[in-house]
């Protein structure tokens, strides 16, 4: 099931040929997002493939940078779906403040920042330069939940 959106950001999604997936339910004991004041915190999102399974593997071992970028992009799509679920209108996003990108990495893999570009590029395409340009942290980790290749969370500033 895909999400229906309206407004400027929805027009960008349509122009880009992107259909948001349904926002994923939390896998364990947490919530998918928290609105606090003028901030939205989106919990870590895993990369879903076209059939709803998790994109798994380790960068530098079983996955290439290009495959990692695709996984990061899939995570970012889930982040945007959570924003839509939380806000109802993606035009309420004033600024994507920060993305944290966790990359399942072999000990010798050092290209986490290139993998994270998959998420950053998607956010910039959807929200545009003024709203979508964000700070970012790209971190290599030994493992992620369910063997996921990448996990992305976000901090978003909201309009009134």
Swiss-Prot record:
Protein keywords: Cytoplasm
UniProt superkingdom: Eukaryota
Pfam families the UniProt entry points to: YjgF_endoribonc
Main localization, broad class: cytoplasm
Disulfide bonds: none
Cytoplasm listed as a keyword: yes
InterPro entries linked to this entry: Endoribo_LPSP/chorism_mut-like, RutC-like_sf
Localization (cell): Cytoplasm
GO cellular component, one term: cytoplasm
Annotated protein name in UniProt: Protein TCP17
Organism name: Trypanosoma cruzi
Top-level taxonomy: Eukaryota, Discoba, Euglenozoa, Kinetoplastea, Metakinetoplastina
């Amino acid at each position: 099931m895909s999400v229906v959106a309206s407004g400027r950001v929805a027009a960008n999604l349509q122009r880009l040929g992107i259909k948001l997936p349904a926002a994923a339910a939390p896998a364990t004991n947490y919530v998918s997002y928290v609105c606090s004041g003028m901030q939205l915190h989106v919990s870590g999102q895993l990369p879903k493939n076209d059939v709803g399974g998790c994109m798994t593997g380790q960068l530098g071992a079983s996955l290439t940078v290009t495959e990692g970028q695709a996984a990061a992009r899939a995570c970012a799509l889930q982040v945007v779906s959570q924003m839509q679920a939380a806000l109802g209108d993606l035009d309420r996003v004033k600024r994507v403040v920060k993305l944290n990108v966790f990359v399942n990495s072999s000990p010798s893999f050092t290209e986490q920042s290139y993998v994270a570009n998959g998420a950053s590029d998607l956010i910039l395409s959807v929200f545009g330069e003024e709203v979508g340009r964000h700070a970012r942290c790209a971190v290599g980790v030994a493992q992620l939940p369910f063997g996921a290749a990448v996990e992305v969370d976000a901090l978003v500033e909201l309009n009134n």
